[in-house]
Amino acid sequence: MMSTVITRKYDPPAIDRGEILRYMGCRRQTPEIEALIDSCLDEANGRLSCKVCYGVFDTDLFCAGKEAAPMGSLDLKKNLTGCSRSILFAATIGIDLDRLIFRYSRLSPARALCFQAIGAERIESLCNAFNEDIRIEYKEKGFLSRPRFSPGYGDFPLSSQKQFFDLLDCPRKIGLSLTESLLMSPSKSVTAIIGLYPDTSETEENCQRKSPDVHGNDCKTCSKLDCSFRKPDLPPESIPSGGISLILRWWRRYTVIILTPEATS
C-alpha cells in the first residue's frame, strides 16, 4: 500500500528543562546556567516552525521476505516484527534555530551550546507529541505502535534517509532537504519509522515491557555506552557537572556545528 503524505503543524510542546540540561552536559542547574537557558529560550520564542509529514505504508514495502533486512537493518527488522503497517515520518522545527547557533558560535559559544541543546530538546519533544498522537489515533483503529526507530539507530544506515525523502517528498511538504553527505537541513530534524501491529497479538502492557520507552529513545536499550548524551541513570564519564567554564570545554571537545548555507542567510 502506497500512502498519501499528510502534513501536520504543531504548536511548540511544553519545554523539558531537564532535557535541555542533559543536552548541555549539565547534571545540575546553577543560577548562571538557569539564567543562560532563560535568556536563550526568550530569544528562541516565536522562531520555531514545528512541522511533521508522514505516510502509512505496508511493512512489506520494506521487508520483501522473511529473511530480508528492511532498509538494510536487522535492528529495524526486529523492531517491525509483527507489524503489518509502518508509519514513515519526518519532523523539523525550522531553520531559524540553526541561524541562532551559527551567529553565536562566533559571538558566544555558551549561547551556541545552549541553543544546540534547546534545539535537540525541541525536536525530540515534537517527535514525542507526534508519537503520542499516532498511538492514540491507531489504538482507536485496533493497532498498537512500536517505538520510533530512526536512521542511525543500531545498524540502521543513514543512507536510508534517501528513501524517506523519496517517499515523503520532504522538501515540498515541510521544507526539509538532504545533503549529499546525508545531513538534514534544518539540522534540528528527525526521520523515523513507527511500526503498527494488530491489538490482538499481545497486550499493550506486554508491548511496553518488551520494548524501549514509548518514544523510542530509551538509553538503557542503546549499546553506545560512551554517548555524551546518555541519560542520568547511566551517566557517561565525559559529561561535566560544573558550571559554564567546564561545559564550554566539553562543547569544544565533543560538539561540531554543521550548518548549511541556508543557516547563514
Model-derived regions: residue spans:
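Conserved active-site and cofactor/substrate-binding residues in soluble primary-metabolism enzymes
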Residues: 35, 39, 121, 125, ...
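Structural signal for hydrophobic packing residues in well-ordered secondary-structure cores
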Residues: 41-48, 131-134, 138, 223-226
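Low-acidity, Ser/Thr- and Arg-rich intrinsically disordered low-complexity segments
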Residues: 252-253, 265
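Short terminal or interdomain "cap/linker" segment that borders an active site or interface and mediates
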Residues: 141-232, 241-251
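Active-site helix-to-loop segments that bind/position phosphate- or nucleotide-bearing substrates
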Residues: 1-112, 241
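Short, intrinsically disordered C-terminal tails of secreted or membrane-associated proteins
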Residues: 260-264
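Conserved mixed alpha/beta catalytic, RNA-binding, or beta-rich assembly cores of soluble enzyme
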Residues: 83-151
